[in-house]
A protein has these predicted regions:
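Beta-lactam-recognizing serine transpeptidase/beta-lactamase-like catalytic domain environment
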Residues: 1-165, 207
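Glycine-rich loops and low-complexity Gly/Arg-rich segments
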Residues: 55-56, 176-179, 188-193
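Short, gly/Ser/Thr-rich active-site loops of penicillin-recognizing serine hydrolases
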Residues: 67-77, 183-207
Length: 207
């Protein structure tokens, strides 16, 4: 029951709303605002395709042996210029691992666990000019009116294996509540991967 996402453009706005597209909408769409709509799974998929260098991924929950060859050898490159992907990867790394980054407090310095990510928020209501001038803290806003907190990340950074998308309903800031959770998850997931990798199956089967 996954809902369709939406990356708006001039054609969509003309057909859906009967209105012209403005330059300012191109700018805000580039940072995920405006009419853009995504689900957490779509965010996770996009993030994974950035991590793997820009190749299309066909997500699946359970591997069906009868269909496992369906996507074999379908290495579709989504971006013409590899430099654009590298720029995004480096920007996400900086956002997490460099001072002034929005999730810097959740960084892990050990390269084994080091990840790259980006914080975000999703508004649940239109904010008026008067409300914006009040400059309220998250805890001062009624719970049901607080932004949802978002965070997407991939890791380990040098050899990406995992993509994470986190949404905390009415959590406020992604850097405050979602990124710290990602830090815990990466530590746990990578440690468990090490255990599986070092597990000698034959040793235990021969007992």
């Amino acid at each position: 029951n996954e809902k369709d996402g939406l990356i708006p453009n001039t054609e969509w706005k003309k057909n859906a709303l009967g209105q012209n597209w403005y330059l300012g909408e191109t700018i805000i769409t580039g940072i995920g605002q405006g009419y853009m709509q995504t689900t957490p799974i779509q965010l996770c998929l996009m993030n994974a395709q950035i991590a793997n260098g820009g190749y299309k991924i066909y997500p699946k929950i359970i591997l069906d042996d009868q269909k496992q060859d369906k996507y074999k050898d379908k290495y579709i490159k989504l971006y013409k210029d590899q430099k654009n992907i590298q720029l995004i990867q480096e920007a996400m790394f900086s956002s997490t691992n460099e001072v002034m980054g929005t999730s810097y407090r959740s960084r892990i310095e050990d390269p084994k666990y080091q990840f790259a990510g980006k914080t975000g928020t999703a508004q649940v209501k239109k904010i008026t000019a008067e409300e914006r001038e009040l400059d309220l803290k998250t805890f001062e806003i009624p719970y049901e009116q607080r932004d949802h907190a978002l965070y997407v990340a991939f890791g380990p950074f040098k050899h990406p294996r995992y993509s994470i998308s986190i949404v905390i309903e009415h959590g406020g800031s992604g850097g405050t509540v979602a990124a710290p959770l990602a830090k815990k998850l990466f530590k746990m997931i990578i440690d468990r991967h090490e255990i599986r990798k070092n597990f000698d199956t034959n040793k235990y089967l021969n007992i």
